[in-house]
UniProtKB/Swiss-Prot annotation:
It comes from the Bacteria. Gene3D superfamilies: 1.10.730.20, HUPs, Ile-tRNA synthetase CP2 domain-like, Valyl/Leucyl/Isoleucyl-tRNA synthetase, editing domain. This is Isoleucine--tRNA ligase. Catalyzes the attachment of isoleucine to tRNA(Ile). As IleRS can inadvertently accommodate and process structurally similar amino acids such as valine, to avoid such errors it has two additional distinct tRNA(Ile)-dependent editing activities. One activity is designated as 'pretransfer' editing and involves the hydrolysis of activated Val-AMP. The other activity is designated 'posttransfer' editing and involves deacylation of mischarged Val-tRNA(Ile). Monomer. A motif ('HIGH' region) lies at residues 57-67. GO terms for biological process: isoleucyl-tRNA aminoacylation.
Length: 930
């Protein structure tokens, strides 16, 4: 036997290298085979409910890192709730209707307008479901736990029926109406868009300054006067029916030198406009208040059949332009509102594809709207005063990335204005984890217009509306519920398969259809109405969930999307918000803080991370960032997170190895019998348990990460485990001192594994498989550790906090001695302490082997004053010299008692007593040489 064999060197097969990319799928298959998700739900039956309702990602393509961050965050919350006494099922979902899928099929060569619609919709459905399957595997590979076999999908008959019923309730309350208001119109999608489908980009446009000649000055202006107008959308002049001025803005009538014409502009802008137009020696003839110009009539710049009326509008400013805007009610919300108030014609001169129509005039007909500027300039002639290119923020279709226009077309609307205050009142009752989120949603609802819910597309849920022979729209409870039942039984494709009369209840009649003839609506619903109905299609309809849901968690873009549409439909139906809490996240940016895009080549696919590092590293990364704001991710950042993971793993490996001979049922030492330092570590760890439990409850992942890493690095590695080897390796295997420390090791190991489970389930299960004395076969079926209360815990914490200060001072003294070449390692030191009464009392209270805690071979508490050479602090001073004696071959301490023993071992008296007591046979035979 060799002397080293008398040491209790920790033994474990738990590998240092995690091998996550290959091991994770093995664990995941084991969980699936064991029906772990279902077992967890059964275990929690009857406990308080917690419903995190999954916002449905769009079923198109593999998931990106933003999806991963979102789903991992949800998984951490649901797992922590499940381990904290809550029944917390998780039903993942997918959003499956809409334009992107139509675009994919178009790229694949499918021609929608050349094939049977029902066949086309079947292709859309098949593609959508294939993407659901693809993303389901992506999410499962992240280790996300949920009811993957029974997700919700917005194209299933039960969901579509629930959506129709949401619409029906809104129709019954009078919240649905048809109107021809201007809406966001995407010529690239050939459809109306909701606000949530708009994103803003910078666009360079040609802006024109031109003049309308006064036709009837109403006794205020002469007919040789021209009103100067500014526009950034020249194509809309073809539909201009008025000029809007600000009632309280001052306008001036001016005549530049050498110019026969007189012009009207805003007084505040005269100087800048004179420079722009090249006007010199401008004479101000008169000043008018805007309201004095009301109802003056001007000529259209080129269309002699059209008169343009001067009207008043609150939206006119003097921030730019001329203080006067032309008004085309068919092409803008403000224009429409003031136009209707003044009985202006709502002219629309652009078709659904962005092509100028016949009513725009023969010179314009057939041109794309963006290309008409040269024709407009030609038509304006000498009425054009200036033109310039401007860059401004402009709305784009978020899917096609093409600019959109405002365009008045008959659409179906949900009247938010009828119940706006109810919605705002409900927002006040919701808990927002970011106060700015509440303000943002509140302001959006307060300021938004009515919701255009109709779309001129094919792949979506039909609007359940019929038309009588006289054109009356029919949407009554009887017909809508009948359609809902048909959808529930056959799916929404039946709308396209059957004639209108076969979609109505048997025997249905209407006074507007004396001949019994009916037509059906061909528009479909906005996809935000699809996902915005999920509270009904899922949360209400699934018995395991509770409505309103406890939490909605999505990206911050969903304040204008899913948070918004869900809130509107839920309040419209039931008068309550669909969620009790909202937690929003920022976007995942690259390592430099730039937005990720394929064109820049700076994207990170979750699958690439899984192959290089493993999903655990992505999961740990999610907790390492403040996801309430935009976050950064790169392979370098993940590499740093991987180092943190390695530190966590190796620390826990040390605990596993050094409790391998510990049976908790037989070897646990009662708390009251622990050494002071072990009690301290137990209490410190209990503080960590509380911090982490509280942070899980508040969804504060970064707090968990920081607290965990700090505990492992500072409390364990830099202190407790630093001197632990002097105990667990050196002392007798069954000695009280070793069992005391193992008791703490094992307690921390078991509990920290449970605390880590929501974040690192793969690693936690791997550790758990080495804990043979724990009863649950999976750690995921256990509960998070409870926070305990210990006698005198505050006093113990105060004592050891003071000791840590003392230890820091001692380490400075040792460092100085090391720099002066007095010692090499700290074990070579004899440390003499010159304490005042406070420190002396402290060291007595610590009641421990202080030399062992400081990892020095000898420590002396001296009486009297410290020598001049000592390193002095306020309460204590230190001197350091080399310890007397020889190095013990077993414990490596320098000890005066170290000597060669009769059994061929050069060891100190302390080690000799351990060896002689525990290894009598080896002592009798003598040890082998080193």
């Amino acid at each position: 036997m060799k002397l080293k064999d008398t040491l209790n060197l920790g033994k474990t097969e738990f590998p240092m290298r995690a091998g996550l990319p290959t091991k994770e799928p093995v664990w995941q298959k084991e969980w699936e085979d064991a029906k772990l998700y279902q077992r967890r739900q059964e275990l929690n039956q009857g406990k308080p409910h917690f419903t995190l309702h999954d916002g449905p990602p769009y079923a198109n393509g593999n998931i990106h890192v933003g999806h991963a961050m979102n789903k991992i965050s949800k998984d951490i919350i649901v797992r922590s709730k499940s381990m904290s006494g809550f029944y917390a099922p998780f039903i993942p979902g997918w959003d499956t209707h809409g334009l992107p899928i139509e675009q994919v099929l178009s790229k694949q060569g499918v021609k929608r307008k050349e094939m049977d619609l029902v066949e086309y919709l079947k292709l859309c459905r098949e593609y959508a479901l294939s993407q659901v399957d693809k993303q389901r595997e992506d999410f499962k590979r992240l280790g996300v736990s949920g009811d993957w076999e029974n997700p919700y999908v917005t194209l299933t008959p039960d969901y579509e029926a629930a959506q129709i019923r949401v619409f029906g309730e809104m129709a019954n309350k009078g919240y649905i109406y048809r109107g021809a208001k201007p809406v966001y119109w995407s010529w690239s999608s050939e459809s109306a868009l909701a606000e949530a489908e708009i994103e803003y980009h910078d666009l360079v446009s040609t802006s024109l300054y031109y003049a309308n000649k006064v036709k009837d000055g109403k006794g205020v202006l002469d007919t040789d006067t021209y009103i100067v107008v500014w526009t950034t959308t020249p194509f809309t002049i073809t539909a201009s029916r008025g000029l809007t001025v600000g009632a309280d803005i001052d306008y001036v009538l001016v005549q530049p030198a050498g110019e026969a014409r007189k012009f009207v502009v805003a007084a505040e802008l005269l100087t800048s406009l004179s420079e722009k137009f090249g006007w010199a020696d401008v004479q101000v003839l008169e000043t008018y208040r805007g309201q004095e110009l009301n109802h003056i009539v001007t000529e259209h710049p080129w269309d002699t059949a059209v008169e343009e009326l001067v009207i008043l509008g609150d939206h006119v400013t003097t921030d730019s332009g001329t203080g006067i805007v032309h008004t085309a009610p068919g092409f803008g919300e403000d224009d429409y509102n003031v136009g209707i108030a003044n009985n202006l014609e709502v002219a629309v001169t652009v078709d659904e594809r962005g092509i100028m129509m016949k009513n725009a005039g023969p010179e314009f007909e057939g041109q794309f709207y963006e290309k008409v500027v040269p024709t407009v300039i030609e038509k304006l002639g000498n009425l054009l005063l200036a033109q310039e290119e401007i860059s401004h923020s402009y709305p784009f279709d978020w899917r096609t990335k093409k600019p959109i226009i405002w365009r008045a077309v008959p659409q179906w609307f949900a009247s938010v204005s009828k119940f706006r205050q109810e919605i705002l009142d409900e927002i006040e009752k919701v808990k927002f984890h970011s106060e700015w989120g509440k303000v943002r949603l509140y302001n959006m609802i307060r300021d938004r217009g009515d919701w255009v819910i109709s779309r001129q597309r094919a792949w979506g849920v039909p609007l359940p509306i019929f038309y009588a022979e006289d054109g009356t729209a029919i949407m009554v409870a009887e017909t809508i519920e009948h359609v809902a039942q048909l959808f529930e039984e056959h799916g929404s494709s039946i709308w396209w398969e059957r004639d209108a009369k076969d979609l109505l209840p048997e025997g249905f009649t209407h006074p507007g259809s004396p001949n019994g003839e009916f037509k059906k609506e061909t528009d479909i619903m906005d996809v935000w109405f699809d996902s915005g109905s999920s509270w009904n299609g899922v949360v209400v309809n699934r018995p395991e969930l509770t409505y309103p849901a406890d939490l909605y968690l999505e990206g911050s873009d969903q304040y204008r999307g899913w948070f918004n549409s869900s809130l509107i439909t839920s309040v419209a139906n039931h008068g309550v918000a669909p969620y009790k809490q909202i937690l929003s996240q920022g976007f995942a940016l690259d390592g430099k803080g730039e937005k990720m895009s394929k064109s820049l080549g700076n994207t990170i696919a979750p699958s690439d991370v899984e192959k290089q590092f493993g999903a655990e590293i992505l999961r740990l990364w999610v907790t390492s960032v403040d996801s309430s704001n935009d976050v950064r991710i790169s392979m370098d950042i993940l590499s740093q997170v991987s180092e943190t993971y390695r530190k966590i793993r190796n620390t826990l490996r040390f605990l596993i190895a050094n409790t391998s001979d510990f049976n908790p049922a037989q070897d646990t030492v009662a708390y009251d019998e622990l050494r002071s330092v072990d009690k301290y570590m137990t209490i410190r760890f209990n503080q960590l348990v509380k911090t982490i439990r509280d942070a899980y409850a508040d969804f504060e992942f970064l707090t968990i990460y920081k607290a965990l890493v700090n505990f492992i690095n500072v409390d364990l590695s830099a202190f407790y485990l630093d001197f632990a080897k002097d105990v667990v390796y050196i002392e007798g295997a069954k000695s009280l001192e070793r069992r005391q420390m193992q008791t703490v090791f094992y307690d921390i190991l078991v509990k920290i594994t449970k605390l880590l489970t929501p974040i690192l389930p793969h690693t936690a299960e791997e550790i758990w498989s080495y804990l043979e004395f724990e009863t649950e076969d999976f750690v995921q079926l256990s509960e998070l550790p409870e926070v305990q209360t210990f006698a005198n815990q505050e006093e113990i914490l105060d004592t050891w906090a003071a000791f840590m200060d003392f230890r820091g001072q001692a380490q400075k003294a040792l460092e100085e001695a090391r720099n002066a070449k007095v010692i090499g390692k700290s074990l070579e030191a004899h440390l003499t302490v010159y304490p005042n009464e406070v420190v002396k009392t402290l060291l007595e209270a610590v009641n421990s082997n202080v030399a062992q805690l400081l990892i020095v071979s000898e420590l002396t508490i001296a009486e009297g004053p410290a020598p001049e050479a000592a390193l002095s602090f306020e309460d204590v001073a230190f001197t350091v010299e080399r310890a007397a004696g020889e190095v013990c071959d077993r414990c490596r301490r320098i000890d005066p008692t170290t000597a060669e023993r009769s059994y061929q071992a050069v060891i100190c008296d302390h080690c000799a007593s351990i060896v002689e007591e525990n290894f009598a046979e080896a002592v009798a035979e003598g040890f082998e040489e080193k």
